């Protein structure tokens, strides 16, 4: 017969002092300690420590340099102000880069609408250099072939006088005219550029005026030399072609500059300035 349980919801009576289960014995395993970190007693860290006197000396040295820079800056500013008051512009030579001879900075100094004209004018200046150099070469060959040393000396004179003369007389006035928009500078350019065009046209033809025209590589001496020495005649024809191209570029430049000169009202301004200067001289 089954045992009767008076209260099925009552907790079971357990004797805490009774030995119900056996506890497994503890193992003999243990945690191994970490190895000690290496310690280098001889390792040192060098920390530069300046003495108070050294710091003061360096501070005084830096202060002296700063004062010197301020003094130089003030002196430079004073000179720039004095130059600005007198209207003198210092032009640093920067062209050509390998051996600067002139000041030339079209992108930064010439207005954008005049840069094309200025570049083509500069091309005509370089073109004149090339024409006169080729003229020296061709005339030298003609001299070797028996034409005499006089024409060679004249070709050297053309180059030595023509290149710097062109820069001083018409290219620099045009450069300054486009940079400052000066009517008088434009007038100087027009006056001397007309002579430049006339010389290039004369050289392209080279009529027998000076030593039968053989000191210049023009068409007329080229035709004459072609019958006696074909190589020299061809060189003269090439030189004549160079002078023709130079003349055409010169005509384009003076037309463009004159169109700007008239369109901007500089012609009337130039007349007023010329009249004013004439009256001042008369007074």
UniProtKB/Swiss-Prot annotation:
InterPro entries: SCAMP (IPR007273). Keywords: Cell membrane, Coiled coil, Cytoplasmic vesicle, Membrane, Transmembrane, Transmembrane helix, Transport. The gene is SCAMP2. Residues 1-123, 255-283 are cytoplasmic. Pfam families: SCAMP. GO terms for biological process: protein transport. This is Secretory carrier-associated membrane protein 2. The lineage of its organism: Eukaryota, Viridiplantae, Streptophyta, Embryophyta, Tracheophyta. The chain crosses the membrane at residues 124-144, 151-171, 186-206, 234-254. It comes from Arabidopsis thaliana. It comes from the Eukaryota. It is found in: Cell membrane; Cytoplasmic vesicle, Secretory vesicle membrane. Its main location: membrane. Probably involved in membrane trafficking. GO terms for cellular component: plasma membrane; transport vesicle membrane.
